[in-house]
Amino acid sequence: MLLDKTSFYAEAGGQEYDTGNIFIDGVADFEVTNVQVYNGYVLHTGRLKYGALEVGNEVFSTYDEVRRSHLRNNHTATHILNFNLREVLGDHIDQKGSLVSPNKLRFDFSHKRQLSLDEVATIERMSDDWIRRDVKVYGKELDLQTAYKIPGLRAVFGESYPDPVRVVTLEHDVDAIVKDIENPKWRRTSVELCGGT
């Protein structure tokens, strides 16, 4: 099903899609089981539970908030992990890919050697600390040229980003960072170009 606008997140950048429902109250209910982008169109796939839908119908859509919440949490965890990998292993760490699903995440990165058990334990301890502190997540669209001026900004090497681009930070508001954009202290927090939830 195609909509003129949608609140559903289509699978992209390693993050899985939203699920939910598109409906006309009491008339029809379409269960969305997958959301993908094809040729610039967001396609909601699933099954019609009851009723009928036609081109031009005004519908309501609602994504599964529990699934989205788990996706959002694991997505934020990839930002935390990316930052802590760089802190422990060095600035040469580059994200190569990721998988964000409701019940797990995978983070692919480049490094010169195998991690030691002590490094893994340190990264895990630091990540747990960020989570325990329940740091605030900020997101804002910036023009690409401004975003690239932020010290410590992380991006996926080889990825093509739109202009403007969404910048996601932990602990510090994006507006505060932009007001003091060349401050080297931004290297001590997670600042990334991001297209996820």
Language-model segment annotations:
Residues M1-T197:
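A glycine- and charged-residue-rich anion-binding loop/surface
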